[in-house]
C-alpha cells in the first residue's frame, strides 16, 4: 500500500501544479535566472542551469520564457535573490521543508511563519526537521520507457542508487519509474539514463523522507491546505513533507 500511497501523492501534486501553471512558470523562470547568474549562461557548461531548463521544459514552459529568463541574468538588471530553507511541522507532526528564493528575507520569513500558524503548523529552526530527509537526485520515466528490469539495469549502469516502479493498477498515467541517485551525481546519472532510455519526464534535486507519517482524511486535508497555502506564495519554490496516505484517503481528497 505504501508504494501506491507515494504515487497517489505524486499524482495529487501534479494535479495541483496544473492548476498553478502560471505560478509554476514564474517559479521555473526564477530558478533559471538564478542558475544562469551564478554560473555560465550556457546550459551545456552549467549543470544547475541545464537541470533547471530541462525541468522547465518538462512542465511545458515556453521556449521564449526560458530564453528571457537566461537573458535577464546576463543583462545585469535582474534582482538578487537569496535562497533560504525553512523547516517546520504540519498537522499531526508531519515534517515540512520549504525552499524559497526571495529579494526580501523579512517579508518571506513573516509570510511563511504566518502560513504555518494559520494552517495548524508551526515554523521551527533550520535543522529542526532536515535530519528526517536526504538530499537526492530524482529522475522519473513513464512506464512506456521499459519494464522494471530494463529500468533497473539502466539505472545500475548509470550509477543510480535505487529504483521504484509502480504499475499504476493498469493505468499507465498513474504509474511510472522513479530513479534515485546521490545529489552530486544527478547530472551524470541523468545524462547516462537519457542515452539509454531517452528523455526523462522529470530530473531534479529533491528532499527524500527517511521516515513517513501516515495520515487519515482529516489530517491529510489540513496538511494539503498548508502545502497549498505555502505554494501560493511567490517566494516559495518547493514544499516537501514526509507523509503518506492510503489510496482510500487519496480518493476522498480528490472528490
Curated annotation (Swiss-Prot):
Family: Belongs to the TACO1 family.
Organism lineage: Bacteria, Pseudomonadati, Pseudomonadota, Alphaproteobacteria, Rhodobacterales
Keyword field: Cytoplasm, DNA-binding, Transcription, Transcription regulation
NCBIfam families for this protein: PRK00110.1, PRK12378.1, YebC/PmpR family DNA-binding transcriptional regulator
One Gene Ontology term of the molecular function aspect: DNA binding
A Pfam family reported for this protein in Swiss-Prot or TrEMBL: TACO1_YebC_N
GO biological process, one term: regulation of DNA-templated transcription
Location in the cell: Cytoplasm
A Gene Ontology cellular-component term: cytosol
InterPro entries, alphabetized: Integrase-like_N, TACO1_YebC-like_2nd/3rd_dom, TACO1_YebC_N, Transcrip_reg_TACO1-like, Transcrip_reg_TACO1-like_dom3, YebC-like
Disulfide bond positions: none
Annotated protein name in UniProt: Probable transcriptional regulatory protein Jann_3380
Amino acid at each position: 500500500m505504501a508504494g501506491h500511497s507515494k504515487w497517489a501523492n505524486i499524482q495529487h501534486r501534479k494535479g495541483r501544479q496544473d492548476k498553478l501553471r502560471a505560478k509554476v512558470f514564474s517559479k521555473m523562470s526564477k530558478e533559471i535566472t538564478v542558475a544562469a547568474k551564478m554560473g555560465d549562461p550556457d546550459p551545456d557548461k552549467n549543470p544547475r542551469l541545464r537541470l533547471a531548463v530541462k525541468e522547465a521544459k518538462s512542465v511545458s514552459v515556453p521556449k521564449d520564457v526560458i530564453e528571457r529568463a537566461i537573458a535577464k541574468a546576463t543583462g545585469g538588471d535582474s534582482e538578487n535573490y537569496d535562497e533560504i530553507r525553512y523547516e517546520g511541522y504540519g498537522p499531526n507532526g508531519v515534517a515540512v521543508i520549504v525552499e524559497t528564493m526571495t529579494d526580501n528575507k523579512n517579508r518571506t520569513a513573516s509570510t511563511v511563519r504566518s502560513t504555518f500558524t494559520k494552517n495548524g503548523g508551526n515554523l521551527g529552526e533550520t535543522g529542526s526537521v532536515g535530519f528526517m530527509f536526504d538530499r537526492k537526485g530524482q529522475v522519473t520515466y513513464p512506464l512506456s520507457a521499459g519494464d522494471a528490469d530494463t529500468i533497473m539495469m539502466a539505472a545500475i549502469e548509470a550509477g543510480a542508487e535505487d529504483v521504484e516502479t509502480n504499475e499504476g493498477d493498469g493505468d499507465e498515467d498513474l504509474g511510472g519509474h522513479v530513479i534515485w541517485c546521490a545529489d552530486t551525481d544527478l547530472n551524470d546519472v541523468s545524462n547516462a539514463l537519457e542515452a539509454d532510455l531517452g528523455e526523462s519526464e522529470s530530473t531534479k534535486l529533491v528532499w527524500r523522507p527517511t521516515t513517513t507519517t501516515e495520515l487519515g482524511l482529516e489530517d491529510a486535508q489540513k496538511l494539503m491546505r498548508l502545502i497549498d497555502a505555502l505554494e501560493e506564495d511567490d517566494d516559495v519554490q518547493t514544499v516537501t513533507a514526509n507523509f503518506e496516505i492510503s489510496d482510500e484517503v487519496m480518493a476522498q481528497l480528490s472528490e
